[in-house]
Amino acid sequence: MTALTILMIILAYLGGSLSSAVLVSRITGLPDPRDHGSHNPGATNVLRLGGRVAALVVLLLDVLKGTAPVYLAWYLQIKPVYLGFIGVAACLGHMYPIFFHFRGGKGVATALGTMMPIGFTMGGAVIGTWLVVLLVSGYSSLASIITVLLSPLFTYLIKPEYTLPVSLLSCLILIRHHENIARLLKGEEPRVWGRQAQRRQEEVGEMDDVAQKRDERDKK
């Protein structure tokens, strides 16, 4: 392993440590996603807290955190066997960001970004699987879990030299989804559909609570 490869691994981790969800939330005045909603700093939770535009920006930035270092390493002619580990470093940065007290996301979007340079076939297989499961089930977490379970198989069939790092990524993401898996088994996992309505109901409830407390204070 060359010094350039080690440098790229470090840079990939540091880039991954830039939490898009937290930064976008701060800029747009949204609540900190680590302390609200599902407490996960990712696009899905930002969607719950702030709407589609902010969530889309977070999603694109998270994907870019995975794609950019792998493409740059490929451009610098780093050996293919190390490209996958550079992608793993980017995902580790997203999951355990050094700049945000190691409280990161679950790494799905960043992992998708690392797989995009493998080829359009791989990217299409991963995105297609996620979309199909999401549309059929309505569960973002279930779509992510099934996609990462199938990703090593897709990689083995398309570019087997990347199977090991993709398998490592899949294991990391599954571990990060252990709470979602438990909620899915209990039937307590919220669906994507209807989240905005649920959020509006919660806001109305909070406004009612504030009004009630104000009335009680006025009576005193």
UniProtKB/Swiss-Prot annotation:
Biological pathway:
Lipid metabolism; phospholipid metabolism
Question: Principal place where this protein is found?
Answer: membrane
For membrane topology, the record states:
Multi-pass membrane protein
Q: Which reaction does it catalyse?
A: an acyl phosphate + sn-glycerol 3-phosphate = a 1-acyl-sn-glycero-3-phosphate + phosphate
Q: Does the keyword rRNA-binding apply?
A: no
**Where does this protein reside within or beyond the cell?**
Cell inner membrane
What GO cellular-component annotations does this UniProt entry give?
Answer: plasma membrane
**Entry's InterPro entries?**
G3P_acylTferase_PlsY
Which SMART domains does the record cross-reference, listed alphabetically?
Answer: G3P_acyltransf
Keyword Repeat, does the record have it? Answer: no
What this chain does, per the entry, is described as: Catalyzes the transfer of an acyl group from acyl-phosphate (acyl-PO(4)) to glycerol-3-phosphate (G3P) to form lysophosphatidic acid (LPA). This enzyme utilizes acyl-phosphate as fatty acyl donor, but not acyl-CoA or acyl-ACP.
The record's subunit annotation is: Probably interacts with PlsX.
Protein known as? Glycerol-3-phosphate acyltransferase
* Species assigned in the record: Aeromonas salmonicida (strain A449)
* Source organism phylogeny: Bacteria, Pseudomonadati, Pseudomonadota, Gammaproteobacteria, Aeromonadales
